[in-house]
Amino acid sequence: MSTPAVFFDRDGTLMEEVHYCGDPAKVRVYAGVSAGLRRLREAGFRTFIVSNQAGIGRGLITEQQYRAVEAELTAQIGEGLIDASYFCPDMPGTPSTRRKPEPGMLFEAAAEFDVDMAASYMIGDKAIDVECGKRAGVKTIQVLTGYGAEQDCAADFRVKDVAEAIDTVLYRSRLPAPSTTSRKSNK
């Protein structure tokens, strides 16, 4: 059976934005991330990271540095709270189905983990994160951390930070689904 998921951008969403972060010592996870991820897991959501990493393609950081930062992020938030992490090293302007705003990384995760995209969310700080979610057919939440305060976009929801975004997902997931049956009038 398909399960709902939450796809998270990494930099500026789960952790403080550090331009082309290649140093694990610079990883600063936002408050509420660990507890929020735990709550999502308890509610039955899969959780994924989807991150553009053009710094690799530009030669500014190595894949090994990226993985060291990812390992530090995992250590700070807690093991087992993220199902999988996907990244795209392609530079802007390079034809790519994986680089956000293209939804390739979301579709990869959906195929690998049998994700119910109609019940899923994309959370990120940038307009490209929101556009990626829309192209994938998931609900979108823009956080005002990272670049979020500078980029107004057509997200389904705009919230202060990832903790509030997770609260929004959990609240919305408890709402009854809209009825698809038509009602007869009593004329």
Which ranges hold each PLM region?
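Short glycine-rich loop/turn motifs that provide flexible caps or phosphate-binding loops at active sites
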Residues: 11, 54, 58, 123, ...
